[in-house]
């Protein structure tokens, strides 16, 4: 019996992302994905059992600054995006949308969802956030509008230095986790669960969310991030 083939993730420049077609569906998936991703970030925070490394930093900064967590997410996203310049990275449409919308979605959810009390409810919230994050990340990746600013930073360093993505990711995420914890961010069960399960969760849903693009675009391509060179979007934190 022939196996059903799923659409592939493609290396696209920002211009190719626009020319790849199916824009209404892709834009819808992009913003639904980012909204779910931001909501999941907020639920992790409300659960109080620890967040993803970058969110530990976001939360830690929010305890020291008169700014909402969403505002900090947006501002830090722009700072990370500036680091793309010496790496000669090119942001995609999804990269810009990520910077602008993720923090707004997180703030709206934090306004709607009160702090969660009781260990059983907190664990249930973490589990729900992992699923929501996985769906959101898969929709975002499947729209094929470029990596998030933090993943683009990692792939840019990889392309310029030749260091492994695993090493770069580990160094960056351990660093932001440590800084965030020192600033007052929460590290706990949710942090460990995110590290272990967000990759499999996103990968599971990705099989249904990758949008089929035009064949003419499929035959060529250089991914947003580094013109003319492949720049694989990591599945684990593609919306980071």
Give residue ranges: language-model regions.
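Core subunits and conserved enzymes of cellular information-processing
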Residues: 2-240
């Amino acid at each position: 019996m022939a196996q059903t083939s799923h659409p592939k993730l493609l290396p696209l420049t920002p211009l190719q992302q626009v020319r790849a077609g199916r824009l209404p569906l892709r834009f819808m998936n992009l913003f639904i994905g980012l909204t779910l991703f931001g909501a999941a970030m907020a639920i992790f925070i409300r659960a109080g059992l620890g967040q993803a490394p970058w969110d530990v930093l976001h939360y830690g900064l929010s305890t020291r600054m008169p700014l909402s967590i969403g505002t900090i997410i947006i501002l830090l996203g722009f700072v990370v995006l500036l680091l793309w310049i010496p790496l000669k990275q090119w942001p995609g449409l999804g990269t810009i949308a990520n910077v602008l919308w993720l923090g707004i979605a997180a703030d709206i959810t934090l306004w709607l969802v009160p702090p969660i009390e009781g260990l059983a409810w907190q664990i249930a919230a973490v589990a729900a956030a992992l699923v929501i994050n996985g769906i959101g990340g898969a929709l975002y990746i499947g729209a094929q509008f470029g990596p998030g600013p933090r993943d683009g930073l990692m792939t840019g360093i990889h392309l310029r230095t030749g260091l492994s993505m695993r090493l770069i990711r580990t160094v960056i995420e351990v660093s932001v986790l440590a800084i965030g914890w020192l600033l007052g961010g929460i590290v706990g069960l949710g942090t460990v669960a995110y590290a272990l399960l967000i990759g499999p969760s996103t990968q599971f849903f990705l099989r249904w969310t990758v949008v089929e693009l035009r064949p003419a675009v499929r035959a060529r391509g250089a991914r947003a991030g580094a013109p003319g060179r492949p720049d694989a979007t990591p599945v684990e934190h593609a919306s980071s």
